[in-house]
Amino acid sequence: MPSTNPNLFEPPTAEQLSRHLEQHPAINVGGLQGRGSLLLMVAVAGLGLILMNQPGFALLPLLGLLALMAYLSGQARTARELQARVNRVWELAMIRRYREALGQAWDLVPACRTKPDLHGRAVTVIAHILGELGKDEAAEVAYGYLMDRLPADHPLALRLRVQRAVAALCSGRLADGDEALRKVRGAAESSTDPTLAASVRMARLVQDVHTGHYADAISEAEQTEAALLPLGIDAAYGHGLLALCFHHLSERDPAADAPQKQQLAERAKALWDKATLLIPASALVYRHPDLKPLLHPPTDPSTTIEPAPPE
């Protein structure tokens, strides 16, 4: 929760985030603001016509118009400042300064209440960072909040449902995650959005790892690698999970002989190297602790997921 040091912002619990979003929901006032400004302009114009022949009051309409222009200018400036702050939060999240970004996004939720688009982007940042920090129950709250405000068949809603399924799987609620994934799989397979298909493939990989179905995961390893490409650097998580599956089979598969186990181990190393070229090993393990056996030597990633705070 909030701290005087932005790098020490503690991620909220699911209950804290739910309460924060309930207290500061988005409010669509765009139409009201537009009609209010129009009414003020009409009032100023009418006042000008009424007082145009009154020397003592001739300047009042002009002053009213200047005041209206100042108000509209202030509103536009505030909107630009909020837009810049939201963009900055995204930039911080992309360079993995998670706690600083999370603290700023937390403050933006009430600040952006009257700007639904910016409000939604701030909540999206919160959901993303909570997932990266392994706070999956809280991430589910954020994803659920966003889903409730989109049509069920909206492309973004489908992606949010996939991410929520991943959060459920990572928090150990395998049945809930499996059910959520089955519900979205049909729509994802018929979608022309490659990112959505890649997200579903990633979710299935997470599911295979958490249920111990390593052989199923590697049976289509090459297709999975290709399918993950639209995710950009986040494909590294998929490469890491595939590497883990090969690693476990190289050590535990009773049907594999020594040469086969060596091949499995080599494939695991190649995939892990590919993953760590995109995302630091410590960050991969922080997001998916199951990957810890792939660290050489095994270390505690809790202190290295983010760059050191600037002095």
Question: What is each of the regions a protein language model found here?
Answer:
Residues 83, 87, 118-125, 156, ...:
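"A position-specific structural signal for the A-helix of alpha-solenoid helical repeats
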Residues 95, 133, 171, 211, ...:
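Structural motif corresponding to the intra-repeat A-B loop/turn of tetratricopeptide repeats
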Residues 106-111, 144-150, 182-190, 222-230, ...:
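Amphipathic alpha-helical segments of tetratricopeptide repeats
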